[in-house]
Amino acid sequence: MTATLPYPANVFVQMLQALDHILDTARTSPSGPPGARIVHARLAPDMFDLSQHVELTCRHALEAEARLAGRPDAVSIDLEGETLEALQALIRRTIDRLRDRAPGEATRTFGSDVEVHTTTGQLFRMSGNEMLDDWAFPQFYFHLVTAYAILRNNGVGLGIRDYLGHMRRHLVSGEDASGGARAES
């Protein structure tokens, strides 16, 4: 359960679980799985493909946690294959790493300076809070939503309920995310 994890690990985990569900929906689609080509699908020729967006979603979650713990650049991502199952395995390993790391991280540097070194050679210096608000969360959500959009663009039947499935736990009345009436408790 993500509620027992400290912030921001709880946010990353619940949205990574949504991404895992989204990929599972693609893999088990009633019209059949989209096939191996889907992991290389893009929204535009100059954009990353699905596998790169999933990898970057995982990377930004792990890097944010590492920076807050005072361990910048302590992240390695190993994608083991080019299938939806391999992408799901990467997501699940990332979730496990966030869960394993989070309880023991007593020292958080929300107010202290952290650095972000980009692959293009840029260096950004900001507080931990600024890093989350201005870098980590925007990057994380951009890549997650783009992965969702690639699947939608390739005919996978997804909707907002797949993306916000975690909101079911807050539903008080009306229909649950599966479309059925929610029983009052």
Language model features: what each stretch is:
Residues 1-9, 21, 169-185:
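Basic/polar N-terminal segments that are highly enriched at the extreme N-terminus
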Residues 3-11, 35-59, 77-87, 123-139, ...:
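Alpha-helical scaffold segments that form or flank carboxylate-/histidine-based iron centers
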Residues 70-82, 153-159:
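Long amphipathic alpha-helical coiled-coil segments
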Residues 129-174, 179:
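C-terminal or internal capping secondary-structure element at the end of a domain, subdomain, or sheet
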Residues 80-119, 123-151:
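Acidic/histidine-rich alpha-helical segments that form the ligand environment
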Residues 16, 20-27, 62-65, 92-99, ...:
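Structural signal for well-ordered, non-membrane alpha-helices
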